[in-house]
Amino acid sequence: MTDENLQADYNEHGIRLGIIQQGIYFNYDYGKGKNWPFQLTQNLNADMFSGYMHDAKPLNGGSHNLDYNLQDGWNSAMWGHTYEYVFPQIYQSENATRDRMPAFFGITKILKVEVMHRVTDYYGPIVYSHFADLEARYMPDTQKEVYNAFFCELDTAVAVLSDYIVEHPGASEFARFDMLLDGDYDSWIKFANSLRMRLAMRIAVASPEKAKTEFRKAVSYTHLTLPTKA
């Protein structure tokens, strides 16, 4: 595909956001045989550790994540695949759309939080605010800093999309690329607020006042209606 093809019909932004969406659960074939990361990042890691999944035929001599003999190769998979394939696409999408494509920018922000909150819940401190910052040498943020950043990202996304809906009623430039919500910007706002509620519940013990504030903020938005697919 040429640069000219990419610039037509929002392809440059839409294709990138499609990769990010599939990168949430790593069910995207990145080429070179990279169509199996979901097994490592989810099945052999969180699913086994939590007891959600068990292997009928013992692997690794019957000693691995199922009995808390944690396997470095399995446990590092989410980190490696996120920072090698998904976060670079997020970073490029933010930079490419920030000033020119507000709707795509807002959706990128929401997807960024959706992708990375799973990563910080796996590992704790993660590289977030200093990603691609060579001077900071990819300094990791604490989990508290990351969660605070998540809430700010969602603030930005909801504000940008809300304004865009008012200024461009009925717009759906992203529809043909959107495998989650069919390019419906109202649904993306609902998703952002339901995601805010989920994150608020995650910090309810560690930071109850912050959790209460964020949960109430989500509920206060007129776009949030829970019995929808968002």
Segments (PLM) and residue ranges:
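Membrane-proximal, proline-rich intrinsically disordered regions
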Residues: 1-53, 81
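Structured, solvent-exposed acidic/aromatic patches
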Residues: 55-224, 230
